[in-house]
């Protein structure tokens, strides 16, 4: 198979020699053959030496590298990559586990498949394209996925309506590529939850907090718990199973509150310990008393672009300052950032600023990140997006 060619400017191949999976538009000297959005191209150095192969896209990231070998991108290629991804999840005990039938099967660059996310919920895989190329190749990828997963996955739902660039004119759609089961209850560490892959955020659930939710369960016994930005209520029902005295879930979205209540009822029917509130987080923190001794702050990304970083850090400081002000002495604070442009150092500084302003004595108990099924490609450290701290507040 002969692909159209992209030639780099002199010296711009150095990052690719270090296996970074992105070719930025500013590194390109010329493009031969006018490739379409999402088309596979070969990348050459200024000396006309092959260096990489990937999906072409108009934008700051011009090529997302699929391989550093000169090979054909076909169904066999997708099968090989998906088989490696599945083997990793098996090693994490996330496949055929009677207590857990949900995991992230493909995590973009972390699985050497930039632009592709696949989450598995029971017998349904939710596939999401974040690049034009993965959208163009979606049907071939779905076929490969079916072959690799066998009976593990019987339904494939494609959910990319909100993740693709509008300018690409790709006709993104949401819908089943294979099957079509209405069953949307999955299992995580023995707890059940509804997955709204039709209209929910991301692929329908935040799989990346699985291990952090499990950790929270250990701290919940006898505590009054506040779960801010609760979305589907994941932290809430782990706290309930951990023996919390009461659990309050807060989210500005009434739809999220409905889903939280459904999930609590699914696991703890009629349990009076839980109450949910559809309210702005900052307003709730302003008006609440000092009844809570375990608080979870897991907000949506405050910054999706670097130009929003300064405002995002102010937002994290303000949010955590409210929690430090109100949490009971001896309380535990779980605080997170999922903003990729906010690194660990920036996030810690924002939280430390809030702690200093509060005048409270604060200790770090745990430093948290994403789980093993959200691997970070060592050559693409930008993939480490989830940061968290567990703090003891005197």
Language-model features: locations:
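Non-catalytic substrate-recognition/targeting regions of SAM-dependent transferases
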Residues: 106-119, 135-206, 214
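S-adenosyl-L-methionine
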Residues: 255-296
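C-terminal catalytic and target-recognition region of SAM-dependent MTase-like enzymes
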Residues: 332-394
């Amino acid at each position: 198979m002969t692909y159209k060619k992209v030639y780099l400017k002199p010296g711009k191949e150095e990052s690719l020699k270090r296996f970074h999976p992105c070719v930025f538009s500013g590194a390109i000297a010329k493009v031969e053959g006018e490739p379409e959005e999402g088309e596979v191209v070969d990348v050459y150095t200024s000396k006309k030496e092959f260096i990489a192969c990937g999906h072409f896209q108009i934008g700051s990231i011009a090529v997302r590298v699929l391989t550093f070998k000169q090979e054909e991108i076909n169904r066999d290629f997708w099968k090989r990559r998906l088989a490696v991804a599945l083997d990793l999840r098996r090693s994490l005990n996330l496949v055929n586990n009677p207590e857990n039938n949900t995991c992230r099967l493909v995590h973009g660059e972390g699985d050497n498949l930039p632009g592709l996310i696949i989450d598995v919920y029971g017998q349904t895989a939710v596939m999401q394209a974040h690049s034009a190329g993965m959208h163009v190749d979606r049907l071939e990828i779905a076929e490969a996925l079916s072959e690799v997963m066998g009976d593990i996955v019987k339904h494939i739902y494609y959910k990319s309506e909100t993740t693709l660039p509008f300018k690409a004119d790709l006709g993104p759609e949401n819908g089943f590529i294979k099957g079509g089961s209405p069953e949307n209850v999955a299992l995580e560490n023995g707890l059940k939850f509804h997955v709204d892959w039709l209209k929910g955020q991301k692929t329908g659930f935040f799989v990346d907090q699985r291990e952090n939710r499990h950790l929270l369960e250990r701290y919940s016994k006898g505590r009054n718990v506040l779960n801010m930005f609760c979305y589907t209520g994941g932290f809430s029902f782990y706290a309930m199973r951990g023996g919390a005295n009461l659990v309050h879930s807060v989210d500005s979205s009434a739809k999220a509150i409905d889903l939280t209540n459904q999930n609590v009822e699914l696991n703890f029917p009629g349990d009076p310990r839980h109450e949910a509130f559809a309210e702005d987080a900052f307003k709730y923190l302003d008006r609440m008393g000092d009844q809570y001794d375990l608080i979870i702050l897991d907000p949506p990304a405050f910054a999706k672009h670097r130009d929003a970083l300064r405002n995002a850090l102010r937002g994290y400081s303000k949010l955590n300052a409210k929690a430090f002000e109100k949490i009971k002495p001896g309380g535990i604070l779980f605080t997170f950032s999922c903003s990729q442009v906010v690194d660990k150092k920036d996030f810690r500084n924002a939280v430390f600023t809030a702690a200093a302003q509060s005048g409270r004595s604060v200790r770090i108990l745990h430093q948290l990140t994403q789980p093993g099924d959200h691997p970070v490609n060592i050559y693409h450290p930008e993939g480490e997006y989830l940061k968290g701290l567990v703090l003891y507040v005197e």
